[in-house]
Amino acid sequence: VAETHDHRVSEIISKKFDVVLAGGITFENVRKIVNSVKPVGIDVSSGVELNNRKNELLIKKICHNLI
């Protein structure tokens, strides 16, 4: 999983600009990040990988946590 950053910076930027977030977004943190930053999009590529392959269960968990 990629490293994430201090999303307080993204919160400030997203008040003036559309933001797409990437890096370190997982099923464990996606809801908190989306609720605080309110991005127009997210890239969860590395956050849904297990052993360098996309993992169906991790994809489902991220989707479930966004509902």
Curated annotation (Swiss-Prot):
> InterPro entries given for it?
Aldolase_TIM, PRAI_dom, RibuloseP-bd_barrel, TrpF_fam
- What is the main EC category here? isomerase
Q: Is Transmembrane included in the keywords of this UniProt record? A: no
The catalysed reaction is: N-(5-phospho-beta-D-ribosyl)anthranilate = 1-(2-carboxyphenylamino)-1-deoxy-D-ribulose 5-phosphate
A biological process from GO: L-tryptophan biosynthetic process
Q: In which pathway does it act?
A: Amino-acid biosynthesis; L-tryptophan biosynthesis; L-tryptophan from chorismate: step 3/5
One matching Pfam family, short form? PRAI
Q: Could you tell me the keywords of this UniProt record?
A: Amino-acid biosynthesis, Aromatic amino acid biosynthesis, Isomerase, Tryptophan biosynthesis
Question: What EC number(s) does this enzyme carry?
Answer: 5.3.1.24
An example molecular function term from Gene Ontology annotations: phosphoribosylanthranilate isomerase activity
Isomerase recorded as keyword? yes
Q: Where is the secretion signal located? A: none
Family listed: Belongs to the TrpF family.
User: Would you tell me the protein name for this molecule?
Assistant: N-(5'-phosphoribosyl)anthranilate isomerase
Q: Which gene encodes it?
A: trpF
